[in-house]
Amino acid sequence: MPSGQHSAQTTKAGAGLVLGLGCERRTPAEEVIALAERALADAGVAPGDLRLVASLDARAEEPAILAAAQHFAVPAAFYDAATLEAEASRLANPSEIVFAYTGCHGVAEGAALVGAGREAVLIVQKIVSAHATAALAGPATLRAEKRIQAAEAV
């Protein structure tokens, strides 16, 4: 396992999409799951396309993050702040406030990108609820397909 990563046991192999999640401590699982489902809907993908839920290692025991992984029947991976911060140049929504609290400029986007790999892109930029954030990363080809579908729909 790469340095900086802690992973739950794998439960299924997916299509390559990674859901990055961040949340305040004790955020209700229902809120995180609803936000995660919104991210998937925004991308126009099915829950079965998801292969991983990812977050900051400080949230490795956060019930809401673990519940989201269980809800989608995918493993959860947790990365340290330095690993997420290495993705800062690829974030769509870097935050100095998040950096002050966590040591990285973006939890949801950073975790999604780390989990999806070096060639991945953000499919859904950070979206927020009252107490959580979510982002979706995956192959650049998926983002291109979504742009083509959107253009054809017009």
Swiss-Prot record:
Query: Per its record, how is this protein called by name?
Result: Protein CobE
Q: Cite the entry's keywords alphabetically.
A: Cobalamin biosynthesis, Porphyrin biosynthesis
Its pathway, per UniProt, is: Cofactor biosynthesis; adenosylcobalamin biosynthesis
Gene3D superfamilies given for it? Answer: CobE/GbiG C-terminal domain (3.30.420.180)
Top-rank taxon: Bacteria
Q: Does the entry feature the keyword Cell wall biogenesis/degradation, yes or no?
A: no
Pfam families, per the entry: CbiG_C
GO terms for biological process, alphabetical: cobalamin biosynthetic process; porphyrin-containing compound biosynthetic process
